[in-house]
C-alpha cells in the first residue's frame, strides 16, 4: 500500500478525475462544483494498492463563508477562525474498506501540512470513530445539512 500526496496543481487531469470519481462513488459529498473544490484543496492524497487507486483524502481550503456557516450551525461560530484547513473527501473504495486506508491517508496529509489547526465534518459513523481515533474531538452540536442529514463537527485535538 503506497500513499502519494500532491498539490492539485501538480496533478494531471486523469488524477483529478480519478479523485473526483472516487469521492462521488462514496456518496458523502454533493458532486455539484466538486471538481473545482478539489482543485482548490491544499493537498490531495491517493492510496495505491496493486496498481489501483483504492482511496483518497484531502486537506481542503474551505471558503470562509462556508466555514462560518458550518460552525454557526454547530453553535460554535466564535471558533470558526481558529481553523485553517478542513480534512475531507476521505473515501476508500468499498471493496477495500476496513484496512486502515482512510486513517493512513488522513495521517499522512496531516503530517505533510505545516498547520495543525484542522477541522472535519461527517455524517458517517465509521468516519466519526476514525476521527476520534486520530485525535479529533467533537465540537459543538450536531447539525442538519441541506439534505436533512445529521452532521458532526470535529476539531483536531493533537496526536494520540
Please identify what each model-predicted range represents.
Residues 35-36, 42, 46-93, 97, ...:
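Conserved acyl-donor/pantetheine-binding loop and adjacent beta-alpha core of acyl/acetyltransferases
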Residues 122-148:
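Conserved active-site alpha-helix within GNAT-family acetyltransferase domains
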Residues 144-160:
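C-terminal "cap" of GNAT-fold acetyltransferases
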Residues 111-124:
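Conserved GNAT acetyl-CoA-binding A-motif
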Residues 88-92, 97-111, 133:
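Conserved acetyl-CoA-binding loop-helix of GNAT-fold acetyltransferases
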Residues 48-52, 60, 122-125, 157-160:
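Short, flexible beta-strand-to-coil junctions
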Residues 1-39, 44-54:
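Short amphipathic alpha-helix that is part of the acyltransferase structural core
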Residues 30-33, 72-75, 104-108:
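A generic local structural motif
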Amino acid at each position: 500500500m503506497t500513499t502519494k500526496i500532491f498539490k492539485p496543481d501538480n496533478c494531471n487531469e486523469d488524477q483529478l478525475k480519478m479523485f473526483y470519481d472516487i469521492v462521488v462513488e462514496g456518496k458523502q459529498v454533493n458532486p455539484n462544483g466538486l471538481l473545482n473544490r478539489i482543485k482548490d484543496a491544499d493537498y490531495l492524497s491517493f492510496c495505491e494498492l496493486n496498481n489501483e487507486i483504492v482511496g483518497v483524502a484531502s486537506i481542503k481550503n474551505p471558503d470562509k463563508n462556508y466555514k462560518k456557516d458550518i460552525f454557526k450551525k454547530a453553535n460554535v461560530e466564535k471558533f470558526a477562525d481558529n481553523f485553517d484547513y478542513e480534512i475531507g473527501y476521505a473515501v476508500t473504495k468499498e471493496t477495500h474498506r476496513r484496512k486502515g486506508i482512510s486513517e493512513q491517508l488522513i495521517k499522512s496529509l496531516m503530517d505533510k501540512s505545516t498547520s495543525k489547526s484542522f477541522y472535519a465534518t461527517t455524517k458517517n459513523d465509521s468516519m466519526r470513530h476514525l476521527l476520534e481515533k486520530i485525535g479529533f474531538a467533537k465540537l459543538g452540536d450536531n447539525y442538519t445539512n441541506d439534505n436533512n442529514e445529521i452532521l458532526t463537527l470535529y476539531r483536531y485535538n493533537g496526536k494520540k
